[in-house]
Amino acid sequence: MAVQQRRSSKHRRDKRRSHDALTAQALSVCQKCGKKKLFHRVCSCGMYGDLRVKKAY
């Protein structure tokens, strides 16, 4: 296993970690029931846009 040759500075460490932040998922609102859903996914009520694609239970 590799061993580091020199200690990394705080600046270099933080620059490396600058791309590690997570972003929240973008959500849309169902036109029929008003629930939040992911884009390009079928809503839990069974609607995909203005098409009914599955039965709601």
Swiss-Prot record:
Compositional bias of type Basic residues: which residue ranges? 7-18
Cite the residue spans of the region called Disordered.
Answer: 1-21
Q: Which GO terms describe its biological process?
A: translation
One annotated GO molecular function is: structural constituent of ribosome
Record keywords: Ribonucleoprotein, Ribosomal protein
Q: What Pfam families does the record point to?
A: Ribosomal_L32p (PF01783)
Give GO cellular component annotations, separated by semicolons.
large ribosomal subunit
- Give the family from UniProt: Belongs to the bacterial ribosomal protein bL32 family.
Q: Tell me which NCBIfam families the record gives.
A: rpmF_bact
- Protein's name according to its UniProt entry: Large ribosomal subunit protein bL32
Species whose genome carries this gene: Mycoplasma pneumoniae (strain ATCC 29342 / M129 / Subtype 1) (Mycoplasmoides pneumoniae)
